[in-house]
Amino acid sequence: MSSAASFRTENDLLGALDVPAQAYYGIQTLRAVNNFRLSGVPISHYPKLVVGLAMVKQAAADANRELGHLSEAKHAAISEACARLIRGDFHEEFVVDMIQGGAGTSTNMNANEVIANIALEAMGHQKGEYQYLHPNDDVNMAQSTNDAYPTAIRLGLLLGHDTLLASLDSLIQAFAAKGKEFDHVLKMGRTQLQDAVPMTLGQEFRAFATTMGEDLARLKTLAPELLTEVNLGGTAIGTGINADPRYQALAVQRLALISGQPVVPAADLIEATSDMGAFVLFSGMLKRTAVKLSKICNDLRLLSSGPRTGINEINLPARQPGSSIMPGKVNPVIPEAVNQVAFQVIGNDLALTMAAEGGQLQLNVMEPLIAFKIFDSIRLLQRAMDMLREHCIVGITANEARCRELVEHSIGLVTALNPYIGYKNATRIARIALESGRGVLELVREEGLLDEASLADILRPENMIAPRLVPLKG
């Protein structure tokens, strides 16, 4: 192919540009690529967003055909193009950076141009021959970026958050399995990094499962609550200018059928076009999940610390050598990585919050950052949870002897004896044990405060890790 044949010339408001001949995107996409060299993350990085865009364009084409505004031939070609995008074809043509000026216009035009050029080829024409089928007049008919783009974002989140839920559920099951496995392992609970009272390692891991289970339940209901109300049909600011009066209801109905999602028209299109509250709340829930996940990873790192000079109650699977200077050192790299993912998700939430606050009047031009951060948080969390489960949780083992040793030598054990020997005796025993370094049980035996049978009964794990009725004294 000659140099001249390697490009096609397209024109827009600002003049002419040479677009790569093989590209399915067009001049407006090319301008955006040249303008926004920012994150290095293109739209194609998030396939469900591309699918959401294609579904919106398909729904719009269906409605416009039914209303008599789009010819059968154009509708058929656009439908073929959208179907291919929904199947996963041509996603590499979505090249615009996720961070962009223009409230998402570059993303919308990237979709319009790619769909138009795929459709043109299906009609037997060349890419760029927009006199036969136009990105704006036909693919974008009765739409504005301001309703098509946020609708596609919502749809992409609805379509994609199931993978996050599946990863979270699998992690919860892994925690629960470890809870069952470690149910018999007695250890010391700790508050404020100090010895507290006995518990089992199983209880600790079941608590991890429970707290993450709360988030799973909330995330399952939150997306349908927040993201199914769409402003498609509102066009520029929510008034529906340039759309058939019958278009909005029909387009949203078609979108629900195409996507399989229970989307409904927004009650107030002007409010829905400018307000980003749903994204703020959904991102806040992702942040909550990240915070909980990070706290669990902090605990795993502490419980496995040592191995000789730390707590060392559990062993994390060794994943790689830990030091270039200290031979034999193995670090808890998986929980450390998850901590960092959590920090990123928390940062994403703050950036999204500021973007939501930064809108003015009838539109929020910061929607591209909102989309980027919320899709990024979902992707990071999903991958982090899979990594944590596969490379850490399922391989954790308990150091049972170490756990029992710490219980037997802990001052905190005196709390379990308090109802039987009295607070005064318990306080004195604790002080002597602390000052002398001797064990609580050793001192109780030495002073004859309890016989061996009573001690054995009190110290049975099931009697120390749950409420127990203590007989009243005389």
How would you describe each model-predicted region?
Residues 1-474:
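Conserved, well-structured ligand/cofactor-binding cores
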